[in-house]
From Swiss-Prot:
It holds the Pfam family Transferrin. It comes from Gallus gallus (Chicken). Hydrogencarbonate 2 binds at T475, R479, A481, G482. One of its GO terms (biological process) is response to lipopolysaccharide. CDD domains: PBP2_transferrin_C (cd13617), PBP2_transferrin_N (cd13618). One of its GO terms (molecular function) is iron ion binding. Belongs to the transferrin family. SUPFAM superfamilies: Periplasmic binding protein-like II (SSF53850). Fe(3+) 2 binds at D414, Y450, Y543, H611. This is Ovotransferrin. Disulfide bonds join C29-C64, C39-C55, C134-C216, C179-C193, C190-C201, C247-C261, C367-C399, C377-C390, C424-C699, C440-C662, C473-C549, C497-C690, C507-C521, C518-C532, C589-C603. PANTHER family: SEROTRANSFERRIN, TRANSFERRIN.
Length: 705
């Protein structure tokens, strides 16, 4: 910091003065003179703020994306297709704030893309070839990118890539005629538009936008209109019963059923920026700007809108006129997660020059956590003749993210993580059963369960009522028996979320490295040490790891009811376990008593659902069928179990729990809430308000959209 020597003459004292730190500057990228003018007005109004604004004008959105990537500008608000482009290499920009819009259902940062048809016309999504179509505009999300990308992805529209001609040419061959404002090169795509022949296909023509595309359908110029879920209610609320939605499963549904009958969720426009230390300054500036100049403020300057402008050149400057506020995007979010799997896939399908070959439909991409799981998964892949392929990540949350992105298909998770995966849009399809093999062939109405228990050494004086200040051992943060249940009970009793202050020290893999709950952890013993990581690289990870932590360092372990039995009496040959006996341990009951390890039905913390395989909803049936085939070969009674055993890994619980007798089918359509049960869902929902993980924050943001 610059020092200035200044003299206070009246007192005759020399003093050292500190100059004010230099102001941070945000460089906003604009793409037109009206937008630059609005930006400069905002700049002038915020000159006295801690963070100031400058404006950088470029010719196009892509020029702005390049400028931000090259550190010549800092931010711009983009629509979904542009945000897709910005997220690709070499730009790698990320969304940091989302525009929020007011709809009849309330404020939201997304909408649904739907296909609207007149009731009584009877055709389905599978009969669109040869029909006439109405679109909001070329390159627009609900009107073009999603419907055309989806039809390409499904193979309905045939297109071999850019070398075979443009996407517009392929669409013109698919529909008999269309109105696609902006598609002036392809005549058939303008044939159904109305107005002056010279301007009827312009981007601001009568049939452009949501209302225009709907009126194209209403006027009989099209058989189907690709719009957003609110369009019919906004344009013909009294006639909505005359229209229906085309669903991707081949059915039709009423207009109000858009949540279950849509082609994709479309994310709002997002402010994108480089993933660097400027992000906080950008959000601080935007937060202050919307506080001073947002909706319902008394300022003459409007950050958003105002809506209802007649001149299209003056519409949507800096932000959409319909925006009512900006909402911070969680830091874990990239453009692919922000846009969502369906929308991202639709756009990818329109960029075949950049696509990798599609994977075979009859195989599964399993997500393995850490090198031990990767090793087992690779052996499974070999004996499965490639029906199972493997991708490896460092932490379980990364599996959830990969499945969300379509980069993996499945992973088996414990109940606490099934909750997180469920918030992230995944569904349970198969669940592990640990006791009764005779039930394996059934599809359970009620999921199988196990008991979460607290275990202490028999020779200690620990009980449930004196745990505060003791040393604790947990399977991992966020897992059911090792975290959710015990911490949920402690949270209910104490009201505190400061769990690392409740115990003197502990090992809860996945905790912050400097937390008390990492102090007992051992790591891998190698380089890097990987201490306190939530994978098998940490010696005290998982059920067996938590028991080992109790044996070597801790006062209490939070584990599953069968863990002690599985690792005592010579069943675990490892040095730390080979001499252990079941009678060395006791259960801690919540009434303060202690009990024999086998009395878990009467002395437990909770009965909880077993681990489950989670997938994206559209993959559920295929993965369920494939896993059934794999289990017939490599399960407990598999025909080829001499080659490989799915449920065996020397007490390490790799990929599945070693105790698993079989995988049973979760009833089709079961939600994660139904699978977890009301009691467990209530406990975990309450607990998750305490310091929610970054992935839960991200998925809660998406779920709230």
């Amino acid at each position: 910091m610059k020092l200035i020597l200044c003299t206070v003459l009246s007192l005759g004292i020399a003093a050292v003065c500190f100059a004010a730190p230099p102001k941070s500057v945000i460089r906003w990228c604009t793409i037109s003179s009206p937008e630059e003018k609005k930006c400069n007005n905002l700049r002038d109004l915020t000159q006295q703020e801690r963070i100031s604004l400058t404006c950088v004008q470029k010719a196009t959105y892509l020029d702005c994306i390049k400028a931000i990537a090259n550190n010549e500008a800092d931010a711009i608000s983009l629509d979904g297709g542009q945000a897709f482009e910005a997220g690709l290499a070499p730009y790698k920009l990320k969304p940091i704030a989302a525009e929020v819009y007011e709809h009849t259902e309330g404020s939201t940062t997304s909408y649904y893309a739907v296909a609207v048809v007149k009731k009584g016309t009877e055709f389905t999504v599978n009969d669109l070839q040869g029909k006439t179509s109405c679109h909001t505009g070329l390159g627009r999300s609900a009107g073009w990118n999603i419907p055309i990308g989806t039809l390409l992805h499904r193979g309905a529209i045939e297109w071999e890539g850019i070398e075979s001609g443009s996407v517009e040419q392929a669409v013109a061959k698919f529909f008999s005629a269309s109105c696609v404002p902006g598609a002036t090169i392809e005549q058939k795509l303008c044939r159904q538009c109305k107005g002056d022949p010279k301007t009827k296909c312009a981007r601001n023509a009568p049939y452009s936008g949501y209302s225009g595309a709907f009126h194209c359908l209403k006027d009989g110029k099209g058989d189907v209109a690709f719009v957003k879920h609110t369009t019919v209610n906004e344009n013909a609320p009294d006639q909505k019963d005359e229209y229906e939605l085309l669903c991707l499963d081949g059915s039709r549904q009423p207009v109000d059923n858009y949540k279950t009958c849509n082609w994709a969720r479309v994310a709002a426009h997002a402010v994108v920026a480089r993933d660097d230390n400027k992000v906080e300054d950008i959000w601080s500036f935007l937060s202050k700007a919307q506080s001073d100049f947002g909706v319902d403020t008394k300022s003459d300057f409007h950050l958003f809108g105002p809506p209802g402008k007649k001149d299209p050149v003056l519409k949507d400057l800096l932000f959409k006129d319909s925006a009512i506020m900006l909402k911070r995007v969680p830091s874990l979010m990239d453009s692919q997660l922000y846009l969502g799997f369906e929308y991202y896939s639709a756009i990818q399908s329109m960029r075949k020059d950049q696509l990798t070959p599609s994977p075979r439909e009859n195989r599964i991409q399993w997500c393995a956590v850490g090198k031990d799981e990767k090793s087992k998964c690779d052996r499974w892949s070999v004996v499965s003749n490639g029906d199972v392929e493997c991708t490896v990540v460092d932490e379980t949350k990364d599996c959830i993210i990969k499945i969300m992105k379509g980069e993996a298909d499945a992973v088996a998770l414990d109940g606490g993580l099934v909750y997180t995966a469920g918030v992230c849009g995944l569904v349970p399809v198969m669940a592990e059963r640990y006791d009764d093999e005779s039930q394996c062939s059934k599809t359970d109405e009620r999921p199988a369960s196990y008991f979460a228990v607290a275990v202490a050494r028999k020779d200690s004086n620990v009980n449930w009522n004196n745990l505060k200040g003791k040393k604790s051992c947990h399977t991992a943060v966020g897992r059911t028996a090792g975290w959710v249940i015990p911490m949920g009970l402690i949270h209910n009793r104490t009201g505190t979320c400061n769990f690392d202050e409740y115990f003197s020290e502990g090992c809860a893999p996945g905790s912050p490295p400097n937390s008390r709950l990492c102090q007992l952890c051992q790591g891998s013993g190698g380089i890097p040490p990987e201490k306190c990581v939530a994978s098998s690289h940490e010696k005290y990870f998982g059920y067996t790891g938590a028991l080992r932590c109790l044996v070597e360092k801790g006062d209490v372990a939070f584990i599953q009811h069968s863990t002690v039995e599985e690792n005592t009496g010579g069943k675990n040959k490892a040095d730390w376990a080979k001499n252990l006996q079941m009678d060395d341990f006791e259960l801690l009951c919540t009434d303060g008593r202690r009990a024999n390890v086998m009395d878990y039905r009467e002395c437990n913390l909770a009965e909880v659902p077993t681990h489950a395989v989670v997938v994206r909803p559209e993959k559920a049936n295929k993965i369920r069928d494939l896993l059934e085939r794999q289990e017939k070969r490599f399960g407990v009674n598999g025909s080829e179990k001499s080659k490989f055993m799915m449920f065996e890994s020397q007490n390490k619980d790799l990929l599945f729990k070693d105790l698993t007798k079989c995988l049973f089918k979760v009833r089709e359509g079961t939600t994660y809430k139904e699978f977890l049960g009301d009691k467990f869902y209530t406990v975990i929902s309450s607990l998750k308000t305490c310091n929610p993980s970054d992935i839960l924050q991200m998925c809660s943001f998406l779920e709230g959209k």
